[in-house]
Swiss-Prot record:
InterPro entries registered for this protein in UniProt: CASP/CASPL, CASP_dom, CASPL
Protein name, UniProt field: CASP-like protein 1C2
Top-level taxon in the UniProt lineage: Eukaryota
Topological region Extracellular: 28-52, 101-128
Major localisation: membrane
Family according to the record: Belongs to the Casparian strip membrane proteins (CASP) family.
Species for this entry: Populus trichocarpa (Western balsam poplar)
Subcellular location: Cell membrane
Assembly with partners or alone: Homodimer and heterodimers.
Glycosylation sites: 38
Signal peptide limits: none
Cellular component GO terms, alphabetical: plasma membrane
Length: 163
């Protein structure tokens, strides 16, 4: 792999790592409470399985990112990198999708099910979740670009080879 391509992919991996760390930090620290009819309502990420899934997915992606930066992959190992980049991209996409669905219900509610929006009562919680979702989307997009770069590295010899 060319040195410029290695620098580019490592830079993208560092950006992805930063995005996953930001998503984890903001999601884990998202909590707020409100007083409703003399009852204290506390909103925190650990109350929702989808938000836990986001944190776990981002943590796995961040761990894989650190490993992929530290190890030097050459030759046949790039095929493994393509597979792991694809798995990471799918994991990030699914975890962000699940968290976004729950965040949408929290923000807008669901009149058909009788669920009221909660962001009016716990705005700090919703703001932190929004930042975590934005960072999670950034990580997923960066990993999609990394997947395309990895595919290019693996497949370019096939298309460039002369008969």
């Amino acid at each position: 792999m060319a040195k410029s391509n290695k620098i580019f992919t490592n830079t993208l991996r560092l950006l992805a790592l930063a995005a996953t760390v930001v998503a984890i930090v903001f999601m884990v620290t998202s909590h707020d409470s409100a007083q409703v009819l003399n009852l204290t309502f506390t909103a925190k990420y650990s109350n929702t399985p989808a938000f836990k899934f986001l944190v776990i997915g981002e943590a796995i992606a961040g761990g894989y990112t650190v490993i992929s930066i530290l190890l030097s992959f050459k030759g046949l190992f790039w095929r493994l990198i393509v597979i792991l980049d694809m798995v990471t991209t799918v994991l990030l996409t699914s975890s962000i999708s699940a968290a976004l669905a729950i965040a949408q219900v929290g923000k807008k509610g669901n009149t058909h099910a009788g669920w009221l929006p909660i962001c009016g009562q716990v705005p700090d919680f919703c703001d932190y979740v929004t930042i975590a979702l934005i960072a999670g989307f950034a990580a997923a997009i960066i990993y999609f670009v990394l997947l395309l770069c990895s595919l290019y590295v693996v497949l370019s010899p096939i298309f460039v080879a002369t008969p």
